[in-house]
From Swiss-Prot:
Keywords per UniProt: Cytoplasm
Keyword Cytoplasm listed: yes
Pfam families: DUF896 (PF05979)
Keyword Cell inner membrane in record: no
Name this polypeptide is given: UPF0291 protein EUBELI_00985
PANTHER family on file: UPF0291 PROTEIN BC_1827 (PTHR37300:SF2), UPF0291 PROTEIN CBO2609/CLC_2481 (PTHR37300)
Localization annotation: Cytoplasm
Lineage: superkingdom: Bacteria
Stored Gene3D superfamilies: Helix hairpin bin
Family, as annotated: Belongs to the UPF0291 family.
Length: 84
């Protein structure tokens, strides 16, 4: 989880890198903090996308993930049929 303190440290290291440069330890810390931030961002985005519901023309609701899974299954079946 990325906290406000983590974001402050990321920004602090960024500004220091522009002003005077970073030590090897600080570069490693910056790299790790950025990786953690990107991971948390992606997990959050995925969670938001998976919670979206799509309303079908018939009025029924379906999860985006379920719709995607159905589409991938259908495409795989079509490709398998073409391969035979």
């Amino acid at each position: 989880m990325v906290t406000e303190k983590t974001l402050e440290r990321i920004n602090e290291l960024y500004h220091k890198s522009k002003a005077e440069g970073l030590t090897d330890a600080e570069l490693a810390e910056q790299k790790q903090l950025r990786a953690d931030y990107v991971k948390a961002f992606r997990e959050n985005l995925r969670g938001q996308l998976e919670s979206i519901k799509i309303k079908n023309p018939d009025g029924s609701l379906i999860d985006v993930k379920a719709r995607h899974d159905e589409k991938m299954k259908r495409l795989a079946e079509e490709q398998a049929e073409k391969g035979n």
